[in-house]
Each structure stands twice: as C-alpha cells, then as structure tokens.
Swiss-Prot record:
Its cofactor is Zn(2+). The gene is ileS. It catalyses: tRNA(Ile) + L-isoleucine + ATP = L-isoleucyl-tRNA(Ile) + AMP + diphosphate. SUPFAM superfamilies: Anticodon-binding domain of a subclass of class I aminoacyl-tRNA synthetases, Nucleotidylyl transferase, ValRS/IleRS/LeuRS editing domain. Coiled coil: none annotated. GO terms for molecular function: aminoacyl-tRNA deacylase activity; ATP binding; isoleucine-tRNA ligase activity; tRNA binding; zinc ion binding. Belongs to the class-I aminoacyl-tRNA synthetase family. IleS type 2 subfamily. This is Isoleucine--tRNA ligase.
C-alpha cells in the first residue's frame, strides 16, 4: 500500500471527526433517544498521570461498540467519563519529581504542600487522553466528567463507608497483609496478586536445637530475614516424622519421612534411628536461633505447634513460624497464644531490637543472616530457588507480608451475597464467571482498606483518647459536630478538626482509603448519591454493562461487587466483557524502554482507527486471551477488509452516476438469483450480529464481516460486473444497482458501532435528502425474514466451495486460472449434484473450464485410497491398528465409494467388527495421467489438465486481456475510455490475438490494433512469450 492510500485514510477519518464535532452528532444521538429506555454503563476510571496505551484503546473500543449499538438499538445511553485521581500512582509521581524519597520527607515538606502538588498533576495528560479517545472514534461525555477527588464524590464515599460500618462490616484489627516497603503502606490482597514475577530467592534449611540435646529439627524457608522473628515451629500432627543420625557430623535430625530422600538422597550417609508421629512432637520446646527475643519464651514462644496445612511436597515437613510475616503463621500462633514480634519498620528495615542488623533492609540482610547461622553451626543447607513472588504493582519492588494494624471491611461476612450476585452476572467470556472471578470470590478475605498515605479520601473516623469512635457519613454531619465550614475533605483540610462531645475530644485517625475503595464506590459517588440524583442512580443500578481487562477480576470488578453486595445485596453490573492483555509482537510486555511496539498514534495515522478497532475486535484479545500486537495485522485488515469495502462503494458510485441510477425508482424490480443470494446473506449476517450482541460476544459479531465483504466484493460484484456495465437501461441492470444500494446502506448501519468512520463515509455518500444526518443517528437495522433464503445460501456456499477446491487444485499444480481447461468432474451426494446441475456454467466460468460434469461416483480417471488416521484411530484401537490398515488396503472401490457417501463403515477383523467414521480415515487419490484430484468437506474435484491447441490459444488471449487492462489501470484511464494498441509479439501470440480479437477488444475497450515489427512500450511475459504494447487513448 502506498503512502497516498495511508494519507487519504487518516485524512478521511479526521474529516469525519470534524463533521461529528461541528454537527454535534454525539449530543444528537443522546437527544434523539431522550425518553427511551436507559442503557446504563459504568466507565472504569483511568489515571490521567500516565499516557493511554493499547490496553486503554482496546477497552475503550469495546465500550464504544456496545454503547453505540445500544443507542442505535433504541436506548438512551449516557456515557460520562471519569478520572481516578487519588492514591499511590499520583503520589509516586510527585515524590519522584520533588525528590521526596527518604522516610519523613513528605512530613517535612508538609502534607498540605504535598497534596496540593498531587492535585496539580492529576490531569497532566488529560489533553492526550481526550485526543486518543476522540481519535479511536470513541464517544464519551467529557463535559460531565466525575473525579474521585471532588468534594461530592468523596462525600458519597464517606456515606458508603458509614453504611458498611452501620451494618457491622467495618472493624479495626491486626492482620498479616501484603505490604509495600517502598510505599510504606499495606496493600489489599487483590493488589498483591497483580504483579507476580519469577525470581531467584534464597533457599535455606535451618537446624533448630531441641532442648536437652535431643537433636535438631530441620525447617526450610525462602525468607531468611524472617528467622530473627521466629516464634514457633509447626508440624502436621497426622504426618510421620523420622529421627536419623548424620554419619559425617554425628548430629541427629528430625524431619518428615516423605521429605527424607530430598535432603538425604544417599541412604549410606545416615543411620536410621526411628519413626515418630507429628502429634508426639507437639508441645516440645527448642532453643531460639537468635537472642533478640529469647525473653518471649516465658510468654509461650519457641514451642512446636500443630498445623494441618503442612504438606511434604516441598520443604522438610516442619515449618518455621514468624507470626508477624506470614498469614498462616499469624493465625496458628494466635490460636496457641504464641507472642508476636515485628522488628521491621515501614521501610522494610530492622528496628533496634535486632541490634546486629539494625537499619538494614531485610532482603539485603538474607546473606548476612545465613552467614551467621553457618558460623554458629545452625545452617544445614544453603541454595537458591526459582519461584513466583509478588511485587508492588506501582513501584515494582518486592512485597512482604507484615502484621499491621489496619481497618478492614469484613468481606468474609458477605461472601455468600457476593457469590449470589455473581450468579446473576453475564460474563463474556463465560468461563470467567465460575473460573477466575468465581474462584477469587470463594477465597475472598477481609479487605484492608486503610492506607497510611496522604493524597486520598480520608477515612471518616474520629477517636477519643478512651477509644470511643465517631464515624461520619456526610459533610453536614461533620459541620454540625465540629462547628466548622467544610470546603474540602482532603487530609490537610480536616486532619486538624477536633470534635468535642460529651466532655471528650475526638481526633481523626491518620489514614486514607485504599483508592480501590473510591473506584468501588463509583456507581453511587459519581452522582453524589444519596445526597443528589438518588432516583436516577437507583434507576440505573445495577449497570447494564461494564468492560475492562482481565486483571480487573481482582480489581475493579471485585471492589464493585463487594460494595454492591454488602449494601444492596445485588451485583453492581449485569453484563461484563473481559479483555486480555496486548503484548509486544515478540510476546513480551510492551515497554517504552525497550521500544518494542509502535505508538498507537503512528498506527492510526498509517492505517486508520477503523483498521485498529477491527483488528482488535476480531482477535482473541476480546475473549480474555493475550494478543501479540502486529502492525502488519492492522495493515492486513485495512488492505483485505476496509479497502475492498471502499472499492465496492466506489464501484457503485462510479456506475450509478454514469447511468443516472435513482434508488427511489426501484419498485417491483425482479431480482436475479445472485441478487437474492447477497440480500439473504446480508440479512442472515444481520441476524447473527444481533444475536451475538445480545450475548455481548463482539468477536462473534465482527468475525462474519470479513467473509461477507469477501462475498460482496469478490463474488457478487465481480460476478455481476457485466450487469452494471450494460449500456441499455435494462431491468437486470436496475436490479443489480438496487440490490447493491440496499446492501451498502444496510451494511453501513450494521458495521456502524464497530467501525464508525468507514460506515459514516459510506452512509454520507449514499444517504438521501430525508435520511438522518448521520449513520449513527439511524436505527440499527432489523432482520427482514422474507429475504432470508437458507437453501439459496447453501447452494451458493456449495458453489463457492467447489470453486475454491478447483482453484486450490490449479494452484497446487501450477495451472494459471486464465488458462482454460476442458473438463472438471465434481463428485458429491446425488441430492447436491442434482441441485447444482443448473449452475454448471457458473462453475465453469469461475474455474475457466469448458465442461462441468456432476457425478455421484468418482470417475474412472481417479482411484480413491483410504488408510487409517493414526492420530485418532490409534487411541481407539491400540495395537489392532495394523489389522485395520490391512483390512482397509484390501477394500474394493465400491465399498470405499459407499463410505465416501455415508461417512461410516464397518470393518471385519476376524469374528469382530469395528465401526469407523470420517475422522478415523485419511483419504487420498491416485489420478490417471493428465488428471488431478482433491477433496473438500463436501466434494471431490477431478481436473482434466490436458491442453489442446485451442485451449492454449485461448489462454494466451486471456493473458493479453489481463495485461492490457493492467496497463489501463496503471495509465489512469477512465473505465469508459477507448484505446488503440500497437503490438509487438511472436507469431503464436499474433495468431491468438487474431483468433480472439473480438473478445480481446470488447474486454479492453480497444478500437484498433496495429502489429509492429519492433519492440515498443512495456514488455510482458505472456505464457512464456515476450510481448510489448503501447496503449493510446482514442477520442470519441
């Protein structure tokens, strides 16, 4: 494709964008549906602190398609855009830009100053977002945007929190949660699941000495830094453990029996002492590894606990427990009254209790700790292990699990409501419902919602010195209790507000909400519910539709579900489309640093937004699978789908204007069979599109477009060209124009939600004076049942299948399509052969074959060969496969032909019989000399390849027509221009020209031919003969 094509595509789309804006078409689509049923849509809010990428464009396209379709299908579809303004993404940008990276730096800079800096950069890339949203062809209402940092939004978040609190679903507690030491704050469990990486970590087995010199317990860990906080060991009471003596060291070890070969593979290296049960070990004491917390022994530390979660598939069957740094450890130690110590600060550095490593980052201390254990003869094994480990989704630093005091939403209390809500949600693809999302709900944990950060919605809890709580649910309530006017709810406006009540002083707790709490409250907060627009909010809840990426099954989809189920015992949305991830072409994550992908702007400038949209919509990424992005794939959509459609429109316009066709004057025209077929295909496609859209299956909706455009351009128009070119104003010509006009108009409306630019371009060139101003103001078409003719579609499908089969034979055996052949034999069921007999001439034209023979039996020129399909049959019959192979080899042609018709056969193996079907058999053909054969799903084609002199001469004539018309196109001649030709060619080509002169002149609009004896003009190879032409336009 040349640059001119690319420029025209981009320029044409820009022109359409201008038309939409100048005529305010989006607003008119809303006005047009005022009073119609509302289709409610929630838009997942992005952060404007980063530029949009392909993932955003993909999700935006999906949302746009569904909303456009709903609007055209008779719904009022408001599309408010929203911005996620709070949280770590914004804070992190400000910290980097201001160099506030040291602990306490933000406090020294001032929380008020810091938050105002955050406010300044929130919309850093808002203009870029608006550009890309517009350029991809997405319609949203930027004039009514909602923002999570707005006073009204934050007040509704307070109302949500207060409502949860009133239901007893909020509590304060200490739990082990994912913790980002880079941010100094806990994360939710679903945030921790968003960024796992394969990493190499230490792998150590440590020797814990039982009291009274009774040997050592061996425990394995990949986090040596937690060993300084060891408070207990755990065994499975039902597992069998062993005591052995290491011959080299003389030490006695206890470990799980099944893990023994893992750590002592050489049976001669140890002496067996005996077995003991896990239960017998429970309660025994051991010596602390480190001296830092040995005083905790009096409080119940350094004992062996029972734990039924222990497995012997890895490790030693004995688990080291640091209750401050492992959830299972925490609960086990809590149950058995083992104390908790947490000598790690919020930056991940050891505190003063661990005097030998104080101030050192815990992950950096792994080597020093292992070295010390080795020096003290407490290290049994040291190595590395490769495993998946969670990293902070924002800072890309390793997370730890840490016991922190936090505020929680009691998700586990409403788990049954969440599971019930999920049952009523329609998921696309469907497996997400009970798979990734359903399983996540089943394992849902209480949600740690408090963050010790700065730029966010403050948690509205005021606490007195004696622990009494005031939970505020509105600005009015806070103003009444504090006596102050509230103009902003951010920390630096309300942290100093003190409430005095009943002789007590209450101050706000120093936390803000997890920003996912903001987005989960979006259905209510976007409308300032319940303070304003309550009726509107309730009428549009749950949303009819949402869409985001697969990662949001543990993000926004989840938080929406938690809050909606808890507050209203309902889902937050009825239908959801989940998309996959767009990767670079090499399969890696798209990376600006690696520069491994083309920019979206470059792609849209080069190939257009429609090509990008259709490329994405017709890929696996809309089925929640990963897509390796390819700019060649986008280019292919443009060249193979959109340009042929544009060419079809140009063809219609050219000849409709040439002959003055008026679409209003088409009543009572008798249609040809091919007209009825393309209309039937159109309305069948329309029915499939409507059905697919009702199921929110965009891939199924757009996939047939490609085949239909192929049917339209490469079959209907190509097969009907002579009808359009008919100089007489015949009924047949008017039928062709009428049919093509209807197809293009209806199809422009069908594709409008999916590829809005080309559909608008088509519609504008076709619409009448009284038609709606834009294709997007039209109703989505309805199926015209009387125009759907299934038998005709099947018949044409059979013809196309046969033609494709014949062409594949020609290609395989290097027989040019322009070279006529004498015979083709089509073999199929008698019923189908009889139905196709009347279209033999059509098949002959397409295959360039003189005589088409329809047969229910394979002709004598071909022998059908069958043998077992070893891949499928081997699984069924095993070692009897050779017997079946011999039996098939001996079958007569009559039985083989019967199998070809029925698709089944019974093979005798001695006294036993085995039934075989088509998938068990591989079919091939042995052809007589001069014949070739091939099969499709329904037919066998046998092609007679023998060339006679008349066939050779006609083949040369057809090649001449092709080359002359190529020169016409290259010379920019109009379709109606007449030409004169000067020809230099060998005798055989001159003879072919003379023999088929009338045909050649008619096909090329040639009025005269002069044979010259010298080379002039462009030279061509015509079936092995060098020929040159000069073309000159002849004035009429």
């Amino acid at each position: 494709m040349d640059n001119e094509d690319k420029i025209s595509i981009s320029a044409k789309e820009e022109k359409i964008l201008s038309f939409w804006k100048e005529q305010d078409i989006f607003q008119k689509t809303l006005d047009n549906r005022e009073g119609c049923p509302t289709f409610s849509f929630y838009d997942g809010p992005p952060f404007a602190t980063g530029l949009p990428h392909y993932g955003h464009l993909l999700a935006g396209t999906i949302k746009d398609v569904v909303c456009r379709y709903a609007s055209m299908d008779g719904h009022y579809v408001p599309r408010r855009f929203g911005w996620d303004c709070h949280g770590v993404p914004v804070e992190y940008e400000v910290e980097k830009s201001l160099g506030l990276t040291e602990p306490g730096a933000i406090e020294r800079f001032g929380v008020a100053n810091f938050n105002e800096e955050c406010r300044k950069i929130v919309f850093r890339y808002a203009d870029e977002w608006k550009y890309f949203v517009d350029r991809i062809g997405r319609w949203v209402d930027f004039s009514a945007t909602w923002r999570t940092m707005d006073l009204s939004f934050m007040e509704s978040v307070w109302w949500v929190f207060r409502s949860l609190y009133d239901q007893g679903l909020v509590y304060e507690g200490t739990k082990v949660v994912p913790f980002s030491t880079k941010l100094g704050t806990p994360l939710s469990n679903f945030e921790a699941g968003q960024n796992y990486k394969e990493v190499d970590d230490p792998s150590v087995v440590v020797k814990f000495a039982l009291q009274d010199n009774q040997g050592f317990l061996l425990a394995w860990t990949t986090t040596p830094w937690t060993l300084v906080s060891n408070m207990a060991l755990a065994v499975h009471p039902e597992l069998t453990y062993v005591r052995i003596k290491d011959k080299e060291s003389g030490d006695e070890y206890i470990l799980g029996q099944e893990s023994l070969p893992r750590w002592f593979p050489d049976r001669e290296s140890y002496e067996w002492i005996g077995q003991l049960s896990g239960k017998s070990l429970v309660g025994q004491s051991y010596e602390p590894l480190f001296p830092y917390f040995q005083d905790k022994k009096e409080l119940g530390a350094f004992r062996i606990l029972p734990a039924d979660f222990i497995e012997e598939s890895e490790g030693t069957g004995i688990v080291h427990m640091a209750p401050a740094f492992g959830e299972a450890d925490f609960f086990a130690c809590q149950e058995h009254n083992v104390p908790l110590v947490c000598p790690v600060d919020n930056q991940g550095c050891y505190t003063a209790e661990v005097k030998d490593f104080v101030g050192e980052y815990i992950k950096s201390a792994d080597k020093g700790i292992a070295r010390r254990l080795k020096n003290e003869n407490k290290l049994f094994y040291q190595g590395t292990v490769r495993h998946r480990y969670p990293f902070c989704w924002r800072t890309d630093s390793p997370l730890i699990y840490k016991a922190v005091n936090s505020w929680f939403v009691a998700v586990e209390k409403v788990k049954s409501k969440m599971l019930k809500a999920n049952e009523s949600i329609h998921w696309t693809p469907g497996h997400i419902k009970q798979g990734r999302f359903g399983k996540w709900l089943e394992g849902a944990r209480d949600w740690a919602i408090s963050r010790n950060r700065y730029w966010g919605t403050p948690i509205p809890i005021w606490r007195s010195d004696d622990g009494e709580l005031l939970v505020i649910g509105s600005i009015q309530e806070l103003e009444a209790l504090s006596g102050q006017k509230i103009v902003d709810l951010h920390r630096h406006f309300i942290d100093e507000i003190e409430i005095n009540q009943n002789g007590k002083s209450f101050r706000r707790i120093p936390y803000v909400f997890d920003c996912w709490f903001d987005s989960g409250a979006m259905p209510y907060a976007q409308n300032h519910y319940p303070f304003e627009r309550a009726e509107e909010t309730e009428a549009c809840f749950p949303a009819d539709f949402i869409a985001e990426g697969l990662d949001q099954t543990r993000g926004w989809f989840y938080t929406l579900t938690v809050i909606a189920a808890a507050l209203f015992d309902q889902p937050a949305f009825k239908n959801v489309i989940v998309n996959g991830i767009i990767l670079a072409e090499d399969g890696n994550k798209m990376s600006k640093r690696l520069n491994n992908y083309p920019s979206p702007k470059m792609i849209m400038d080069a190939y257009g937004a429609d090509a990008l949209r259709l490329y994405l919509l017709n890929s696996v990424v809309v089925k929640a699978e990963d897509l390796r992005f390819s700019d060649k794939g986008v280019e292919s959509v443009l060249k193979q789908v959109l340009l042929p459609l544009s060419n079809a429109l140009a063809f219609y316009k050219t000849y409709a204007e040439l002959y003055g066709f008026d679409p209003k004057e088409t009543d009572n025209i008798e249609l040809a069979e091919i007209d009825r077929w393309i209309l039937s295909s159109l309305y069948s496609l329309l029915g499939k599109t409507r059905e697919s859209m009702s199921q929110y299956d965009l891939h199924a909706a757009v996939n047939p477009f490609v085949d239909f455009i192929e049917d339209l351009t490469n079959w209907y128009i190509r097969r009907s060209r002579r009808r359009f070119w008919d100089a007489e104003d015949s009924t047949d010509r008017r039928a062709a124009f009428s049919t093509l006009y209807e197809v293009l108009v209806v199809f422009s409306k069908v594709i409008a939600p999916f590829i809005p630019f080309i559909s608008e371009d088509m519609y504008q060139q076709l619409r009448g004076e009284t038609d709606p101003e834009s294709v997007h103001l039209c109703d989505f078409p309805h199926v015209v049942l009387e125009k759907i003719l299934p038998n005709l579609e099947r018949k044409m499908q059979d013809i196309r299948e046969i033609v494709a089969l014949g062409h594949s034979l020609r290609k395989e055996h290097k027989l040019k399509v322009r070279q006529p052949l004498q015979n083709v034999y089509i073999v199929g069921s008698q019923e189908r052969m009889e139905a196709l007999a009347q279209v033999g001439s059509l098949i002959g034209e397409e295959l360039n074959v003189k005589d088409v023979h329809f047969c229910s039996e394979t002709p004598e020129y071909v022998t059908t060969l069958i043998k077992p399909n070893f891949r499928t049959l081997g699984k069924k019959v095993g070692n009897r496969l050779p017997e079946i192979q011999r039996a098939l080899a001996g079958l007569p042609q009559e039985q083989i032909q019967a199998f070809m018709h029925k698709g089944q056969m019974v093979v005798s193996l001695g006294e036993e019989t085995i039934s075989l079907d088509k998938e068990d058999i591989t079919v091939s053909w042995a052809s007589a000399e001069g014949f070739v054969a091939r099969s499709s799903a329904s037919f066998v084609a046998v092609l007679d390849c023998q060339l006679t002199e008349p066939l050779i001469m006609e083949g040369i004539a057809r090649e001449l027509v092709n080359k002359i018309n190529t020169m016409r196109r290259n010379g920019k001649l109009h379709v109606s221009d007449r030409i004169a030709i000067r020809l230099h060619a060998p005798v055989i080509v001159q003879e072919a020209f003379a023999l088929h002169k009338e045909y050649i002149c008619e096909e090329t609009l040639t009025t005269s031919v002069s044979v010259i004896d010298y080379k002039e003009g462009e030279e061509w190879d015509i079936n092995g003969h060098a020929v040159s032409f000069v073309l000159e336009r002849v004035e009429r």
